[in-house]
Amino acid sequence: MSEKLANKINDKIEKLPRFSQIADKALIAEKERSLSGEPSEDHGLHDPKFAKQILQMTNFTTYGFAGNRAGSFETEAFLGEDVLRGVLLAFSLREFVDRELHAYGLGKGEFWEHSMNCALSAWMIATKVAYDDLEMAFVAGLMHDIGKVILDEFLSEEREKFVDITSQGYVTPVEAERTIFGVDHAEIGAQVAAHWGFDEKISEAIRCHHEPELAVQDPDLVTIVHLADCISVSLGLATQEKSLIGLLSSDFSGLGL
C-alpha cells in the first residue's frame, strides 16, 4: 500500500466519531425511557419485543426461528443481558452500517442484514459450544466486516479492476483487495475497532476472520466468527464473497463442533 493511500485511510479512520459518541445517543434514549417512570421491563435491554424486532429485520427465520417456534424469541437464553447489550450496540451502529456499499455490490440494507445475521450466527455457535462470552461473540460477528465501510470509498475508484480480478474465479475478493491496495477490509476493520476502543480480542476476530489459523489471543472467538460468516454467506445473505465458502476451515474440533 502506498504511503499516500495509507495516510488517506488512516485519516478517514481518525475522523470517525468515537464509538462513545455513537452509543451515547442510544444510552441517553434508554435513560430517558427509564426516567419516564414506566416499567423497565417494557423497554430497551429487557424488552422481548426489542430482541424480536432485530430478528425480524433479518432473514433469521432461515435458522429455524419461525412458525410455531416463534416463542424462541422470548427464551431466557436469547434474552440474556450479555446478548441484549450487543443488540443495543447493533442499534447504535445501524446508522453507520446501514448503507449502500457500491464497490462490493451491496444495496442499502444488505450490509446491515449480513452483519446482523453473522452476529446472531456467532451468538448461536458460541451458545452451542459454551463459549464464555456471548456478548463478545455477538459484537465480533456484528463488526467483522466493518472495514468495508471505510474501504468502499477507495475501492469504488478501482471498481472496474476489482470486478475484473474477481470475475476470473480463482481470486477471492479479499485477495483482490490486497492486490489493489496491499491491505484488506479485515485489517482496516481491526483498526476501526481499535480506534473505537473495543477489546483486543474483537480486533483480532475482525482481523483474522478470513484466516482463523492466524489467531493468537482467542482462537475460539476467531473461529466462531469465521464459521458464522461462512454460514451467513452460504445461505445467500451476502452478494459478495461467495468464494469464501471454499475457504471454510475443516478443523473445528477445538470448538466441539
Predicted regions and their residues:
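Short, intrinsically disordered, charge-balanced linker/junction segments flanking boundaries
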Residues: 176, 252-257
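Conserved alpha-helical "signature site"
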Residues: 1-163, 167-246
